[in-house]
Amino acid sequence: MYKIEEYKRLTENIFLMKIKAPRVATKCLAGQFVIVRIDEKGERIPLTICDFDRLNKTVTVVVQEIGATTLKMGKLREGQFILDFVGPLGTPSELTNKSIEELNKLNIVFVAGGVGVAPVYPQLNYLKEKGIKADVIVGAKSKNQLILQDELKVVAENVYITTDDGALGDKGLVTDKLEKLVNEGKHYDLCIAIGPVIMMKFVCLLTKRLGIRTIVSMNPIMVDGTGMCGACRLIVGDKVKFACVDGPEFDGHMVDFDGVMNRLKLYKTEEGRAYLKEQEKETHHGGCGLCGGED
């Protein structure tokens, strides 16, 4: 059992939880995720690690309420417990494998949409601790859907806000802001984009045109976090990959985003899942040969 040390409501449908998880807190790195199950009857939920405290043995996750399980999780409070908190899983951020010398040569910009801010924060924090400066562009529909603004300002060199309605920051999309910054003279060698699939697609279309290498984190398409359900299957270049096993980070210019979006639409229905299973045969799963997580 894992104790909830802190609960904070960030928006109407997004909340933050700090969980006492000594083993995960000791081993995790920026970019990794955990699988959470709140009780015996609960489904497995993959959640990206937003922050961790090795001294106090806690791990912070940010959760968007999009289904019955996340709604139920959102009703828990400090002092209550979660049944399973498994991790760290997935490959750490590419940044954690680079030397200080390599990082110093890069001008890095993060582009985050919605809850994509959560996995961006620990990467910015990692760079900050190494003395590396990086910018971040954050997008949301309106200001009441923006999260972790104050936290980002502590770890990023520049925080650029965009909202669809112009209620805060620049009116428009994150791609508009990125292109504007480049046109104004900003130079970036590396872009790390995390957010809705459609957002990452258009960021990658822009950065390919601008000649900026781009990494995307495919956390949003994961369902059970083990490769068993096949939901996070995607094509990268000409190879089949699974976000939860092989990622979640991939070369954004190699990802077939249209295929990902079509797959997500099909995966929402039982008929669609059956169709995908038949079409993809043995490549439907991440090597398990089962179809767990589809019930």
Where are these regions (language model features)?
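Short, surface-exposed secondary-structure boundary micro-motifs
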Residues: 39, 87-88, 237
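Short, Lys/Arg- and Gly-enriched loop/turn segments at beta-strand edges
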Residues: 42-51, 89-100, 243-244
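Ferredoxin-reductase
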Residues: 1-80
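Local cysteine-cluster metal-coordination motifs and their immediate loop/turn environment
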Residues: 119, 197, 219-249, 283-295
